[in-house]
Amino acid sequence: VNSHLEHFGLRENPFEIVTDPRFFYASREHREAMARLAYLVDQQSMYFGMLTGEIGSGKSITRKVFTAKIDWQQHYVVELENSGFTFEELMTQVLVKSGQNRRDIGTNGGAARLFGLLTSLATELRRQQGRQLVIVLDEAQDLDPDALRQLKRLSNLNGEIDGRITVVLIGQPELRQNVAELPPLDQRISLRFHLPNLAADEASAYLRHRLEVAGRTGGALFDEEAVGLIYRVTRGVPREINRLAKLSLGGAAAGRASRVDRGQVETIVEDLRRHQSLPAAFAGPP
């Protein structure tokens, strides 16, 4: 543990930009997103869902927490953290993650063969285990139009086989436009939810939660004015809150302060502006 963490009684860095489910903060909107995704999966008759959000809004950590809570006795979940592939490559990864040998999948037959293998997988899961196949694709804005068109065909399988396939698309806002340009797929999206940034009244609880997970047992580490400035500068984007809070924490520790105050946050913000390290959207006055 480095010195500035020890200074504040922390076991680990509370503001690392990682998708560690322990640090998930269940804001009102994040709870709503998970409730809607759970409904989508549990219904087993709504074949496509779409969760979007700006970069840094917490989509990937929401995905991890959501899939961890799915009832695996009823559902078989396959997650792909990157969707920047062709349809054939994506479905091959789904099959490999489902336990099939890549050599057995083969390279001949293209999409038709992959559809056959997916049909067999979904049918086997339903008949032998009573489970539904759930495919979760993160960074889905990177899917090319052909892959999106092919994904739509998966919903057709639900009327043809003794199995069910639900696909959850997770991505940045441009995913919505990409889907809208393909009406046959757009019409199959049964659930849509856009994950907004944190509300102003949630910033303090967000920081406190992450600090407590990291080992903080004392009182509030960021004073009220510091929290307010962090929120205004970052516009409530969780990833940017983490970045500014981490730097402010380090600055406070270097000065042997017992808490992080507004002045310490201002120092970091001015330094970031001077080096043009704040996102363009946050470059104005706080």
Role assignments for model-derived ranges:
Residues 1-45, 278-286:
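A short, basic N-terminal segment
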Residues 5, 86-89, 101-150, 159-162, ...:
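Mid-core helix/loop region of P-loop NTP-binding domains shared across ATPases and GTPases
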Residues 10-17, 74-75, 85-105:
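Conserved NTP-binding/hydrolysis module of P-loop NTPases
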Residues 43-65:
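Walker A/P-loop nucleotide-binding motif
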Residues 66-70, 173-188:
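Short regulatory helix/loop adjacent to the ATP-binding pocket of P-loop NTPases
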Residues 80-84, 179, 190-203:
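Conserved AAA+ ATPase "SRH/arginine-finger" region at the nucleotide-binding site
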Residues 96-98, 172-173, 198-217:
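Conserved AAA+ ATPase "sensor/coupling" helix adjacent to the nucleotide-binding pocket
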Residues 104, 177, 212-286:
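C-terminal alpha-helical "lid" subdomain
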